[in-house]
């Protein structure tokens, strides 16, 4: 499953913070302080922007394989209305985020899905059921150490999963008609991390079980830049639940129906053959996973990034796979390779801007460039880069990204002597920051990290 790394990488070109470094909520770190309301506004997902022929290939690759590479012989889905039950101690923002997600699935994917009434007992519900259970992270990782959140078929709660964790009952490749699934989410992490888990895991409970690094426009991608279900994802789910498809179909049977379905549901994607990405070697995927992993330290991660870039160039790619390889190589490069890293980062941004959904990745690169500009006292450049990135961060509802950009921008304003504007921007960003980083202590740590860069720039300017 996803959540290998945090959505935001550590500031600067030299490192990328893994998810394990995101501060968790606890009583000593302000977890009991009410979180200001973060309001992302009306959902405005990035649209499906690729030719239908490409998305047909993506559907088949996502739908007929597991993340591990194991094949899935038969198409599977729920038949009929799906209901969602919540159990455990759901954090304050989680249920509102769940309701927002379910409304999007109804409106954008056309799926009949809704919450069970709070008083209803999941065990008494005879229909299709997805249970979302909130648990302490420690309890989850004692059983599944590598997963931050995940979804399991044919169980209704944690005890049911633990009792059957070595049983073929929970083997997704054996499921044809889905009737029950349980999503397990840590209750003691940030609101944004919880929201992101809900989007991907419920998306997988309903639809595809695979992730593809080359899909820059999808949450079904372990690079973690898309944090909520995109237009591509919603279109895929709408096709997934079209009446022309039925559980038990083979890959060839589904493939025969997909072009007509996509052309009907996405008329603007008609008539273009699109690009054929070719096979992505498993060795490249493993190298990317190593570069993104929190295990093994910086040296091992850097080696993974270098190997991924070498493999991408050997393959002759000029798509999001090369862009991701360049980006990770730049972020993990040692300080004495700063010039080469900058060139790689700029090349990655150019490739991402030419890729559907890649504007999100390019906006993250703008943030990294803004940090470098701030360190050099180039306040005008900081304001230009952050202004370009902020609409994408807001549109994709990435609160941590929004807050980080605002804090960087505030330091640039302070460099220009616009202290009142800087203070107002920091204050206005607190709701997004608390949602994205979780606790007051975590917000303060991020603000202080950026403030130190701004302070150093002011000291240099005073010399």
Write out the residue ranges for each language-model feature.
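Structural signature of alpha-solenoid helical repeat scaffolds
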Residues: 317, 356-357, 397, 437
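Metalloprotease/metallohydrolase-associated module, dominated by Zn2+-dependent proteases
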Residues: 18-26, 67-69, 156-181, 185-193, ...
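Metzincin-family zinc-dependent endopeptidase catalytic domain
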Residues: 96-199, 204-205, 209-215, 323, ...
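TPR/TPR-like (Sel1-like) alpha-helical repeat modules
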Residues: 346, 384-391, 417-437
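C-terminal motif of bacterial Sec signal peptides marking the signal peptidase cleavage site
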Residues: 12-15
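Helix-turn-helix repeat elements of alpha-solenoid scaffolds
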Residues: 280-281, 292-310, 334-347, 378-388, ...
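Disordered inhibitory propeptide/activation segment of secreted metzincin zinc metalloprotease zymogens
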Residues: 17-83
């Amino acid at each position: 499953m996803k959540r290998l790394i945090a959505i935001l990488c550590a500031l600067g070109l030299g490192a990328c913070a893994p998810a394990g470094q995101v501060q968790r909520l606890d009583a000593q770190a302000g977890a009991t302080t009410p979180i200001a309301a973060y309001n992302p506004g009306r959902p405005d997902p990035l649209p499906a922007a690729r030719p239908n022929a490409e998305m047909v290939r993506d559907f088949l690759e996502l739908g007929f394989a597991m993340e591990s590479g194991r094949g899935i012989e038969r198409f599977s889905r729920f038949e009929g209305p799906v209901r969602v039950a919540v159990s455990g101690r759901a954090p304050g923002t989680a249920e509102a985020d769940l309701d927002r997600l379910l409304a999007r699935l109804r409106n954008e994917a056309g799926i009949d899905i809704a919450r069970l009434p709070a008083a209803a007992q999941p065990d008494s519900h005879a229909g299709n059921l997805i249970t979302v259970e909130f648990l302490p992270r420690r309890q989850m990782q004692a059983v599944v150490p590598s997963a931050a959140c995940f979804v399991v078929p044919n169980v209704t709660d944690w005890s049911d999963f633990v009792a059957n964790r070595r049983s073929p009952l929970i083997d997704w490749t054996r499921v044809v008609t889905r009737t029950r699934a349980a999503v397990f989410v840590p209750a003691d992490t940030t609101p944004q991390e919880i929201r992101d888990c809900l989007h991907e895991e419920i998306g997988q409970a309903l639809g595809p079980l695979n992730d593809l690094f080359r899909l820059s426009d999808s949450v079904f991608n372990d690079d973690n830049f898309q944090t909520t279900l995109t237009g591509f994802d919603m279109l895929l789910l709408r096709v997934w639940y079209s009446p022309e498809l039925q559980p038990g179909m083979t890959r060839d049977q589904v493939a025969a129906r997909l072009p007509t379905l996509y052309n009907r549901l996405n008329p603007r994607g008609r008539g273009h053959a699109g690009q054929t990405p070719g096979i992505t070697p498993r060795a490249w995927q493993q190298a990317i996973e190593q570069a993104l992993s929190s295990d093994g330290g910086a040296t091992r991660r850097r080696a993974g990034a270098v190997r991924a870039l070498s493999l991408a160039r050997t393959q002759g790619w000029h798509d999001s796979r090369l862009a991701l390889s360049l980006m990770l190589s730049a972020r993990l490069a040692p300080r004495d390779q700063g010039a080469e890293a900058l060139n790689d980062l700029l090349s990655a941004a150019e490739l991402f801007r030419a890729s559907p959904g890649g504007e999100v990745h390019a906006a993250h690169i703008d943030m990294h460039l803004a940090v470098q500009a701030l360190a050099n006292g180039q306040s005008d450049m900081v304001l230009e880069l952050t202004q370009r990135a902020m609409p994408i961060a807001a549109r994709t509802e990435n609160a941590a990204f929004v807050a980080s950009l605002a804090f960087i921008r505030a330091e640039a304003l302070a460099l220009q002597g616009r202290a009142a504007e800087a203070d107002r921007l920091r204050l206005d960003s607190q709701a997004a920051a608390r949602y994205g980083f979780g606790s007051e202590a975590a917000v303060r740590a991020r603000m202080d990290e950026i403030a130190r860069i701004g302070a150093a720039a002011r000291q240099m300017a005073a010399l």
